[in-house]
Amino acid sequence: MNTSIMRGFAHARTACAAFIAFFLLLMVCSLPANAIEIQEVVSPKGIHAWLVEDSSVPLVSMRFSFKGGTSQDPAGKEGLANLMTGLFDEGAGDLDSDSFQEQIDNLGAEMSFSASGDSVSGNIRMLAENRDAVTGLLALAVNNPRFDQDAIDRIRQQVVASIEASQRNPSTIASRKFGEVLYGNHPYGRPDEGTVKSLQTISRDDLLNFHRTNFARDRLTIGVVGSIDAKELGEMLDRVFGDLPAMAELVPVPDAKLALGTTTSLSFDMPQTSISFVYPAVPRKDPEFFAAYLMNHILGGGFTSRLYAEVREKRGLAYSVSSAMVLRDHVSALMISTATRPEKAQESLKIIREQVAAMANDGPTEAELAAAKSYLKGSYAVNNLTSSVSIADTLVGLQEAELPRDYIDKRGELIDAVTLDQVKTIAKKLLQAEPAILIYGPAQS
């Protein structure tokens, strides 16, 4: 299991990197958080996108996402979506792999694709003057990927080599095993990249069918930032996505049920013992989300958190300890993670459990809540709005969470509205559950 909302194979070709990086730096400086104006653009063919215009630098960044992802991989063909993302720039339309990538390079563009459990996503950055040519190539990749057999075999072997290398990594082995335990037979319990065995079963027809059933306009979310206006963007959207099917043919995915109360223990010859706790959380759209968000920050979300103070600062048990809310389409979880010396593993477990129990029973103080509100309001721009790429990513994330365009402006008010009693209530609701635990390291721990 991977704790990040986005995991997969990202195959990117970057050219003129220093040139683009220079303009990206200028764009960062030109987009203060309080000046971001989000427009909703609807193309002539009805494709929706959110746009932040910035003509101060001649760049355009776009992120797009198709709902589905690796959860749509058929049983026995795990890794299909991930493999597909590695093939989009390996030839499209009349262009073979070399020709396609040469044109991307010559245009100074960056194009990448990735797959997670919930979506297949793409990113593109380009000079505004090359926009038509670059998006013409993107249109070929999105609509008419070639999936040539030689490219399939080559990219498949790269993924296989990566899997085989990761099978020597205790962290990866433990993460995959924990995912199987935590999610059971749910698609989230499968590795996004598949297995060596499952990858061998994937054919060109499988790739073509997955592309046909998953890439459709009704599952598409788009965020664009840079030197482009609404009219130009509408034309670009239709050029790239307008010929896709109107409706996807996705297999329904049930909500996942966390296997709480389980302990997964694995022995490895390694210098430290790693520990993870998983508790339930609430979805992004839940009315109690901000109360849970604040509670998590106070518990383990930063250098001033209770876990950091008790585990690292007071006792020196670990270099780092943290908690985070992991929000996916079909499950929400709160994960606590740390690594410690083997002889201190049981003490670390004990201290973490004590801090969780204290939060569940008594909640935070008024002072802790006030500090958390101040930090989380002030850090949003730094974490989400520091570059054209991060802004485009944020635009997609807000739409996928079904949040309004004025969310960034209203977010501070939503945080301030949370009361101490609400945080205490959600802490008791979530943290009194018996967690799922992963512990791996030397046998003596």
Residue ranges and their predicted role:
Residues A17-S30:
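Bacterial N-terminal signal peptides
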Residues L31-Q103, N123-M126, G136-L137, L208-E310, ...:
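His/Glu-rich zincin catalytic helix
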Residues V52, V57-T85, S97-N143, T172-K197, ...:
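M16 family metallopeptidases and their MPP-like homologs
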Residues G91-D94, N143-D150:
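Short, polar/flexible loop-turn hinges at active-site or ligand-entry regions and domain interfaces
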Residues G117-I124, D150-A161:
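Short, glycine/charge-rich beta-strand/loop segments that flank catalytic centers
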Residues V159-S166, A256-L266, S374-N383:
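Short, conserved secondary-structure transition motifs
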Residues L207, V423:
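Acidic/histidine-enriched active-site and ligand-binding environments that engage anionic O-linkages
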